[in-house]
Amino acid sequence: MHAVSMTIIGAGSYGTALAIVLARNGHHVLLWGYNPQHIRELQEYRCNQAFLPDVQFPDNLCPEDSLETAIKASRNILIAVPSHVFHQVLYNIRPYLDQHSRIIWATKGLEHGTGRLLQEVAREILGDKIPLAVFSGPTFAKELAIGLPTAITIAASDTEFSEELQQLFHFDKSFRVYKNSDMIGVQLGGAVKNVIAIGAGISDGMGFGANARIALITRGLAEISRLGIAMGAELSTFMGMTGLGDLVLTCTDNQSRNRRFGMLLGQGVDIEEAKKQIDQIVEGYLNTKEVHMLAQRIRVEMPITEQIYHVLYCGKSVSEAANALLSRQLKDEMYDTVRF
């Protein structure tokens, strides 16, 4: 019998925030991170001084430095790590899983180097029998941790699992959880919105104003939807929390690292200096390459993503990228929706 309701792998800002929410909801939670010194600090100070210094841990949130202990303590394993290490984390935890284990992830992105959905990665490494679920939606870790009202979406490989997770996380005072059966759409929305957010930041950094920002968000949503439909997702998913909701949040609020990174580029800061100034992982920078790779592989037109890719990886200037988008052939607004 597992004694812990949830083990969370990843003691960054988002993993910590999710652990706090679960613990406040009365559940016993273990929080594991790869850096033993960081875990010792969490244990000593009972808060995450590096990322959420003003939020104290509930008594039933326990930082744990042993991966084996953390995994074996609960059947529910939630992974909240950057997308480029997701693959390795699955390999690391696999020896400690048992026949009752279930995997959830809050990682937003595609597999580094392949552009595969994280669901595909999990199935390849863990097999077909283990239940899978993904968390996504418009959430900033700080607001989640301090208890401001937040809504999120869960998509799982079976209905019973998603309903159980919905009940586990739902907190009447501040945290509302929706179900969605479309795992593909939920994953893609969370991955591609970071790329579009860099574009929104570039636009604002260049001083293009509110009109341009909203046009970019709207056409970005069209790109996400077009890619999703080609991958087998439901169009309605992109009108919800993990599509429109997460996209608008990430493109318009300066808590978003992706938006801030783009703003620096738009102001003329070079890529390496912009990454240095953000001083945390910019998922959109990593995922632009993977999203571009995926779009080319399945032959889906994504002009905003393409121009951001050229800026980040091919040396194109932000002004050249903006001109390329503005000078594209005129289109019917719905051309890219009805073609599927």
From Swiss-Prot:
Record-linked Pfam families: NAD_Gly3P_dh_C, NAD_Gly3P_dh_N
Protein EC: 1.1.1.94
Sequence positions that bind sn-glycerol 3-phosphate: K108, G137, T139, K193, D246, S256, R257, N258
GO MF annotation, one: NAD binding
GO process annotations (BP): carbohydrate metabolic process; glycerol-3-phosphate biosynthetic process; glycerol-3-phosphate catabolic process; glycerophospholipid biosynthetic process
Origin: domain of life: Bacteria
EC primary class: oxidoreductase
Ranges that cross the membrane: none
Keyword field contains Cytoplasm: yes
Pathway note: Membrane lipid metabolism; glycerophospholipid metabolism
Principal localisation: cytoplasm
UniProt entry keywords in alphabetical sequence: Cytoplasm, Lipid biosynthesis, Lipid metabolism, NAD, NADP, Nucleotide-binding, Oxidoreductase, Phospholipid biosynthesis, Phospholipid metabolism
Cellular compartments annotated: Cytoplasm
Catalytic reactions of this protein: sn-glycerol 3-phosphate + NAD(+) = dihydroxyacetone phosphate + NADH + H(+); sn-glycerol 3-phosphate + NADP(+) = dihydroxyacetone phosphate + NADPH + H(+)
One CC-aspect GO term: cytosol
Active-site residues (renumbered): K193 (proton acceptor)
Segments forming a coiled coil: none
Annotated protein name in UniProt: Glycerol-3-phosphate dehydrogenase [NAD(P)+]
Lineage: Bacteria, Pseudomonadati, Pseudomonadota, Alphaproteobacteria, Hyphomicrobiales
